[in-house]
């Protein structure tokens, strides 16, 4: 027999959904049969799987240990093998982490053998004792926003289910304010809001910018503020009004001011010179500030406006 106590990260979902995650090698038919026969109970009573779980609810599995081991895969595994350095944590509480992603590291895996920030965060939470590895069966912390591999800066991850849901919502509705800094070729003197249309080519993973709408394009808006100038380059603060793939890089390049070190949209001769002279291997684009919306929902309302 085994007893499961519903945690805050598991509350709110249906019983059958939780059981399917926990005993992920068992078929749905088996789980429903065990509930009908009262081999699986909820708070000491017969259940059918449709019950909405609350924190502290007690699920009992009147099954042999061998059966449980068979249908749970024998034990929860850590998300990755190998060595992951501790993430550069800027802020952490019980609901979220804010991490400084280095250039060159994927935000999330594209292939099974990839190394990514998401796995580094999971390993940190487990190794630090913040999250038991067994919890990965029913809840998996995850990042809420992604940066390009060669863009550095702030990435938010949800540590709790509530934190993950709230942060996913504000990134989706764009109510969180995102600020970047970058160094571009040429001189820009004044604050500007630029607009256009972006179309992505999925086969080449590149985007094109157009002044007018074209087929399969989406509208974009980017605001920049010059902070410093020297040596033929300008340091900009960039605010994303919309947030599209490669938007900052391609939009600035389209007005003749590509980001230094951007080998996809930038000036290749300038980049090669900077690589030769300074060892520059990634674009000088950094996500440096995030500001939460004033109406940030509970339980993260203590971060509203911060």
What does each model-identified segment do?
Residues 43, 108, 158, 210, ...:
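Thr-Gly-centered strand-to-loop micro-motif
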